[in-house]
């Protein structure tokens, strides 16, 4: 069986930056304890488990404001997905030390939205309902930012404003965004369009669209809550025409998916640790459908290998 290692795949710079920021916080003895992350720093349980080993507490919940109410003291890290101005204000009110690990691409979209709101625009924001990135973006001004996920959501919009801008969550499928933007343009011909798919997401999606075409099956290594990982599986099926399965790690691979495959493509979400993906590739490369001894799927990557290395600060 041939394993097609789709390139590029895995960690993007926004994810690495966020993890390095969080690790440096853990190593800084001057910062007040406890140290919390407001939601998952990135959508990967292996990463949050590794941070737990370092004494960083990940708090999750329905929304960032709700999670914040659980914290009375210490240091709070804002995740790569960004937060609303209201969350930042509330953290200041509570006297918490805050560290912002928002991805620069998300910050860029927030700044664009703020600029357009100041010019009197209403914003249509294409994103995944219940995901923290749209929550942070829409939270800039919930009365003038309209979250849409589907064509039906667009049809339900009733905006009466000469100034309308449409933009999007950075990790959406670029094909879905293009389709929804076209629908918005049809409904509001005067709309100003700003496609904000981040370059890392775009390159990874295009790589799957092209490189998974020849495979019998695609394995996407990524957390179930990772939007960009789920979109890679979608791109494999809808654009490359190759059946795809998303797995959190090697233990979730079903032998039935691969036993008859001649070629298996492998990619990974932007928040998937490289050693976790390597373990999947190593398993597939040694897999023999006729030898049950090669079927054992066991995750052996220690948590210490999950996070990027940083230098400890000298006291």
UniProtKB/Swiss-Prot annotation:
GO BP terms in the entry: dimethylallyl diphosphate biosynthetic process; isopentenyl diphosphate biosynthetic process, methylerythritol 4-phosphate pathway; terpenoid biosynthetic process
Molecular function terms from GO: 4 iron, 4 sulfur cluster binding; 4-hydroxy-3-methylbut-2-enyl diphosphate reductase activity; metal ion binding
Pathway info: Isoprenoid biosynthesis; dimethylallyl diphosphate biosynthesis; dimethylallyl diphosphate from (2E)-4-hydroxy-3-methylbutenyl diphosphate: step 1/1; Isoprenoid biosynthesis; isopentenyl diphosphate biosynthesis via DXP pathway; isopentenyl diphosphate from 1-deoxy-D-xylulose 5-phosphate: step 6/6
Binding site for isopentenyl diphosphate: 43, 81, 131, 226, 228, 271
Iron-sulfur among keywords: yes
Record keywords: 4Fe-4S, Iron, Iron-sulfur, Isoprene biosynthesis, Metal-binding, Oxidoreductase
Matches recorded under InterPro entries: LytB/IspH
Residues annotated as binding [4Fe-4S] cluster: 12, 103, 198
Similarity field: Belongs to the IspH family.
Any matching Pfam family: LYTB
Cofactor detail note: Binds 1 [4Fe-4S] cluster per subunit.
Organism: Geobacillus sp. (strain WCH70)
EC number(s) on file: 1.17.7.4
Cysteines paired by S-S bonds: none
Known catalytic reactions: isopentenyl diphosphate + 2 oxidized [2Fe-2S]-[ferredoxin] + H2O = (2E)-4-hydroxy-3-methylbut-2-enyl diphosphate + 2 reduced [2Fe-2S]-[ferredoxin] + 2 H(+); dimethylallyl diphosphate + 2 oxidized [2Fe-2S]-[ferredoxin] + H2O = (2E)-4-hydroxy-3-methylbut-2-enyl diphosphate + 2 reduced [2Fe-2S]-[ferredoxin] + 2 H(+)
Chain positions recorded as dimethylallyl diphosphate binding sites: 43, 81, 131, 226, 228, 271
Binding site for (2E)-4-hydroxy-3-methylbut-2-enyl diphosphate: 43, 81, 131, 170, 226, 228, 271
Function recorded in the entry: Catalyzes the conversion of 1-hydroxy-2-methyl-2-(E)-butenyl 4-diphosphate (HMBPP) into a mixture of isopentenyl diphosphate (IPP) and dimethylallyl diphosphate (DMAPP). Acts in the terminal step of the DOXP/MEP pathway for isoprenoid precursor biosynthesis.
Name of this protein: 4-hydroxy-3-methylbut-2-enyl diphosphate reductase
């Amino acid at each position: 069986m041939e394993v097609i290692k789709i390139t590029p795949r895995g960690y993007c710079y926004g994810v690495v930056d966020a993890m390095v920021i969080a690790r440096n916080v853990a190593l800084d003895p001057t910062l007040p304890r406890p140290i919390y992350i407001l939601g998952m720093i990135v959508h990967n349980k292996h990463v949050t488990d590794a941070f737990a080993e370092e004494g960083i507490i990940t708090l999750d919940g329905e929304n960032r404001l709700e999670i914040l109410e659980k914290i009375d003291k210490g240091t709070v890290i804002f995740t790569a997905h960004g937060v609303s101005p209201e969350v930042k204000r509330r953290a200041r009110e509570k006297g918490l030390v805050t560290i912002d690990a928002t991805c620069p691409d998300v910050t860029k979209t927030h700044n664009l939205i703020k600029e357009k709101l100041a010019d009197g625009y209403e914003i249509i924001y294409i994103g995944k309902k219940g995901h923290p990135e749209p929550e942070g973006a829409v939270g800039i001004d919930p009365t003038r930012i309209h979250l849409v996920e589907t064509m039906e959501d667009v049809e339900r919009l009733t905006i009466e404003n000469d100034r309308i801008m449409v933009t999007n969550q950075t990790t959406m499928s670029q094909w879905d965004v293009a389709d929804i933007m076209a629908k918005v343009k049809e409904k509001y011909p005067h709309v100003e369009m700003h496609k904000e798919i981040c370059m890392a997401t775009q390159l990874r999606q295009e790589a799957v669209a092209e490189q998974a075409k020849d495979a019998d099956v695609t394995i996407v290594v990524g957390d179930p809550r990772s939007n960009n990982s789920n979109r890679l599986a979608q791109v494999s099926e809808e654009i490359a025409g190759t059946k795809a399965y998303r797995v959190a790690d090697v233990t979730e691979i079903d032998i039935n998916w691969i036993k008859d495959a001649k070629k298996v493509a492998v990619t990974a979400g932007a928040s998937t640790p490289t050693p976790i993906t390597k373990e999947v590739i190593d398993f597939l490369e040694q897999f023999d459908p006729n030898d049950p001894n090669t079927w054992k799927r066991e995750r052996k990557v220690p948590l210490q290998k999950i996070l990027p290395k940083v230098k400890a600060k000298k006291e």
